[in-house]
Regions:
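Mid-length scaffold segments of soluble, non-membrane domains
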Residues: 99-134, 138-140
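C-terminal amphipathic alpha-helix
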Residues: 33-35, 42-47, 51-68, 82, ...
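C-terminal segment of classical bacterial N-terminal signal peptides
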Residues: 16-25
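Bacterial N-terminal signal peptides that target proteins for export
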Residues: 1-10
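Membrane-helix exit/interface motif
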Residues: 90-97, 116-124, 146-150
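Cleaved targeting-peptide boundary
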Residues: 26-34, 38
Length: 217
């Protein structure tokens, strides 16, 4: 009797696990067969490198923002690391678009960082005129990046890239405003959203490269 009862309990436990949220997510995640196709090793590497570089972009963006607003002694060191990250991103596209294109992207991204530093400084000093000016310049730089990338790859539309970059700036601004208000929950939430979004941007870039250069994968 005890043995039969144990078997019944075990059966119900198995059924419960099969219908648990994780099991449901696993089924949903399997999706359509095309999405289950294995990525080629070189595609996996590009995706990983691109995601890592852009996640680093968010991490060091935040690190610099924290340091600059608090006037910490590590500000210059953090800025140097953040600027190096833009070189890392430029280097990722060099095997596909060449040295000149990679350096051009790096230069545009470094400008993005430099303008962002001015935005942070103006916001910290509550200088509304400068904040408005530098914010407009920030979006102009985003337009330049979108235009450059879309001209290099027809799989990246200028409007799609603008939308992605504008969203990135919006989330950085949310993070900045939250830190200035000392609203730490909002700051963390903005960073989490920013990190999720930057992975989307990275994957769009990866997908475009794979489509344009299938023979390299």
């Amino acid at each position: 009797m005890k043995s039969k009862l144990s078997k019944v309990v075990l059966l119900f436990m198995c059924l419960a696990l099969l219908n648990s949220p994780l099991a449901v997510q696993a089924k949903e995640g399997s999706g359509d067969p095309q999405q289950q196709e294995s990525l080629k090793p070189k595609e996996v590497k590009l995706q990983g490198d691109m995601r890592r570089a852009w996640i680093d972009h968010m991490i060091w963006d935040r690190g610099y923002m924290v340091s600059a607003l608090a006037g910490l002694k590590d500000q210059d060191k953090v800025l140097a690391r953040l600027l190096k990250n833009q070189e890392d991103i430029g280097n990722i596209i060099k095997p596909y678009f060449g040295e000149e294109a990679g350096n051009k992207l790096t230069a545009l991204l470094k400008e993005h960082i430099q303008i962002g530093g001015k935005v942070i400084d103006a916001a910290k000093k509550k200088n509304e005129a400068d904040l408005k000016k530098f914010n407009a310049d920030w979006f102009r730089n985003a337009d330049d990046i979108a235009k450059f990338l879309s001209s290099a790859n027809p799989n990246w539309t200028e409007q799609e890239l603008k939308d992605l970059l504008y969203k990135h700036l919006q989330l950085l601004t949310e993070m900045l405003q939250a830190r200035l208000k000392k609203d730490w929950d909002a700051d963390i939430a903005a960073f989490d959203k920013g990190e999720d979004h930057i992975i989307v941007l990275a994957d769009v870039l990866t997908e475009g490269i794979i489509k344009q250069f299938p023979n390299q994968f």
